[in-house]
Amino acid sequence: MEPVDRMRELLSFIYGPETGRDTHEALHALLDGWRGRLPSPDEEYASGRLPLDHTDAVLITYGDQFGRKGEAPLATLGEFLREYLSGTMKGVHILPFFPYSSDDGFSVMDYRRVNPEWGTWDDVRRISEDFRLMVDLVLNHCSAKSEWFRRFLQGDPEYEDFFITVEPGTDLSGVFRPRALPLVHEFESAKGPVLVWTTFSRDQVDLNYANPRVLLEMIDIFLFYVSQGAQIIRLDAIAYLWKELGTPCIHHPKTHAVVKLFRAICEEVCPWVLIITETNVPHKENISYFGDMDEAHLVYQFALPPLVLDAFLRKDVSYLREWARTIDTYGGKVSYFNFLASHDGIGVLPARGILPDEYIDAMIEAVKDRGGLISYKSTPQGEVPYELNINYLSAISESHLDRPTRARKFLASQAVMLSLVGMPGIYVHSLLGSENWREGVEKTGMNRTINRQKLSYEGVLEELRDPESLRSMVFEGYLDMLAARRKSRAFDPRGMQEVLEAPETVFALLRRSPDATEEVLCLINVSHIEQECVFPSSIFRTAPDAHLFTELTSGDTLVPYREDEDRFSISLGGYEVLWLTPYRDKG
């Protein structure tokens, strides 16, 4: 079915035949207005083809991550990207850079403006000229201090149905709660007190998608971001979009229909743009946003951060390995956004049903011991942990270890993410080897601040120039791994992976390119003890009798020990990472 026809069907499902038809006509006019105004990349992408390859990796950062006197932070960020990451990191996710009132950007006051304290759209476009730009569409809610909400409270008829109100005494007990905060808050309007739906906080008021004008407005903003250079758009908190009393108001069928609508719009007017859904929920629910390959192009691997942390805490990859075996590559039509750290904490919910409760409890205690904090949410059974707030390096590498060991252990954890099928997303504080920022939590009172420190640009550069600093060791090691990853098409997100048997302390994976001509054997030791792995000699399809390997990161030639004609063995040092490909004589 053509995208235009899919749009018509979806809008009829969402709004009913009559309103759906009117909304489709309005959408058709909106899309016509954008045609020819959207800057496509040099390469044209056919609808249905995932425009990613092994060179893709995304830096996750705030727009004001780096401060330098007399310069807009977005301009400083652009300089850092061009000077230090060109040719190594292909994309950048700039977290919300719009005027905001709270939540470090996720309470948007004006969707079409750049925060003037950070820079201008010119700064954003300049970054998009050199890097694949990922932008947030914060579409579940906006700021209670926004012009939209102000006009709603004033009784402006243009905005009277932009937000969701409920009558006092309405039974909301069946609504899924991601936070330990009230679901509704009272505001004073021109008509008197009103109770407004607030999924996340009093300052984040939920938008009413039962009003087609809200949906059309967000589609227009989506395309505006594309016009400014965005090639990946993150649908923030999308799982909670559609509200219907009597349902949990999470993963509603009409929410999925809205995602399908955005996908159809991309295929119609901007097929080079990728949609990624942010749904911090159990794995099975998370991947439901692939739909029938007609929703998100990418979903976050929310289970990965807690599973990798568990593997390093217990020196046992068993649960990580079994979960990785369930990952479907879907023939390369969609893929995963692999990450271990972000501006948020480590989600507990995605690990439920994968890790035993006692291991999750042990992880929570370990996070506390390593200087982290725990955030809770409300359930009918009371408040339960939903997020571990800690810098990932602080979580993985104990502070009493020497710097080289801390760096090596942390980089081994990152190698798991870089090895798995999907596109890597690397949080700036992981790339830079940052640690817990407890002083920030004391300043803001927010647990998440522990991993959101803003940095002096000159101060960071000074540390990176010191080869003995933890920042330098992590940064240089990370760049080496990223450069090595770009050497082999086996790491293509559309490729294949096979999870291998190995000692419980070793995560072993075979990656294969989409055309099956390149392969990499990925080995990561999650313990400090040397380990030996034995594999069949025929493990590489492209070179079944290979007697020599090339290690991609170091470029060294490795000679495995031949156990017999059918098997070889490889030894890994503590926290060692090996990416091995069959040796090919360059002569």
Curated annotation (Swiss-Prot):
Its EC number is 2.4.1.352. GO terms for biological process: carbohydrate metabolic process. Keywords: Carbohydrate metabolism, Glycosyltransferase, Transferase. The active site is at D236. PANTHER family: SUCROSE PHOSPHORYLASE. Catalyzes the reversible phosphorolysis of glucosylglycerate into alpha-D-glucose 1-phosphate (Glc1P) and D-glycerate. May be a regulator of intracellular levels of glucosylglycerate, a compatible solute that primarily protects organisms facing salt stress and very specific nutritional constraints. Cannot catalyze the phosphorolysis of sucrose. Belongs to the glycosyl hydrolase 13 family. Glucosylglycerate phosphorylase subfamily. This is Glucosylglycerate phosphorylase. It comes from Spirochaeta thermophila (strain ATCC 700085 / DSM 6578 / Z-1203).
